[in-house]
Amino acid sequence: MIISISTSIFPREDNPTYLLAFLQKIKSAGFDYVEIGRKHTNISNRIEEIASIGIKVWAIHGDLPRNAISFDETLRQQAVEEELRRMDDTAAYAPCPYVIHYMDRLQDPRFGRQFRKSIEQLHAKAKELGFVLAIETAPYKPQVNERYPDSKEISDFVRSFQSPNVRVTVDINHSNLKEDLIQVAANCRGVIGNIHVSDNMGLWEDHLPPGEGTINIRGVLLALIKCGYTGPCNVECHHQNPTTPILKQIRINTEKICENL
């Protein structure tokens, strides 16, 4: 199984040179694939520089603003248009997964209807550009969200589009907090377009590097593969000091977990 890693392991990009430096570290650590995280913008101006590093882009993480579920149509449309611009900005990497958070986490069902309207607009753009909208499974955070949309709800939402351009991103670090991950894989059978792989201790979305928590990641990967996933082990973890040696160790540990998958 190929290993990919998200640039979300690095801090927000405050300088245009940072992303290139981050990617050079990732390449030096032995990774060949990345997901470009939502902390990075103005990608279209740096396509050639990114290509010169010799790293391939597996996925793009979108950054759909919260107003995408607003009842104020002007605000909602502004949020959607902002995301459409990001899709255009990263279009050189299509076809690939384009990750979007599932925002229907409030009790009032009207928010869900607004979210669907926004996704319908993004779906049209995804078909135009060749992206696969990959709707991410949500974390269980009752301290933050009014309700928990489980993997069945999210996979049913995805299936309702009946489109190859809408799929699920199974975030095992999110779903592990409330659901059995083998059941999550089964719920998402046939519509898994991307995965986010990190570890936790079962209480919070710690985003630990694979192997540093309590999740049976190899077993989950096997289940995801059996349920139709064909992409890389896409690591999306956090680290306070992601030096090249640290990144290399994350790669080595993840390769051991994925051996012969």
Q: For each predicted feature, which ranges?
A:
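Active-site cleft segment of glycoside hydrolase catalytic domains centered on the general acid/base Glu
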Residues: D108-L122, A126, N145
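A structural signal for short, well-ordered beta-strand segments and their strand-loop junctions
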Residues: E35, V99, L133-I135, T169
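Structural motif corresponding to the early beta-alpha repeats
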Residues: D32, G37-Q114, T230-P232, C237-Q240
